[in-house]
Swiss-Prot record:
Pfam families: Ribosomal_L29. GO terms for molecular function: structural constituent of ribosome. This is Large ribosomal subunit protein uL29. SUPFAM superfamilies: Ribosomal protein L29 (L29p). The keyword Membrane does not apply. NCBIfam families: L29 (TIGR00012). Keywords: Ribonucleoprotein, Ribosomal protein. GO terms for cellular component: ribonucleoprotein complex; ribosome. The keyword Ribonucleoprotein applies. One of its GO terms (biological process) is translation. Gene3D superfamilies: 1.10.287.310. Belongs to the universal ribosomal protein uL29 family.
Length: 67
């Protein structure tokens, strides 16, 4: 997911996306434990997307505090 796409979403959409990505990450972790042939890089991409979303949410929260 691109940072431009993330910044264009509302806070509610970001929270929903964050919830879904965390759920997906848990599924990937469990699948990796059970099946060694799974794509190991997919989990790291999900983690990076989660970090991007949290960064944007944090920036927006700080903007509100500074205003």
């Amino acid at each position: 997911m691109d940072i431009i796409d993330i910044r264009s979403k509302t806070n509610d959409e970001l929270h929903e996306l964050l919830f879904n990505l965390r759920k997906e990450l848990i599924d990937v972790i469990l699948t990796k434990k059970l099946d060694k042939s799974h794509n190991h890089f997919y989990g790291s991409n999900i983690k990076k997307d989660i970090a991007r979303i949290l960064t944007v949410l944090s920036e927006r929260k700080n903007e509100v505090k500074n205003v």
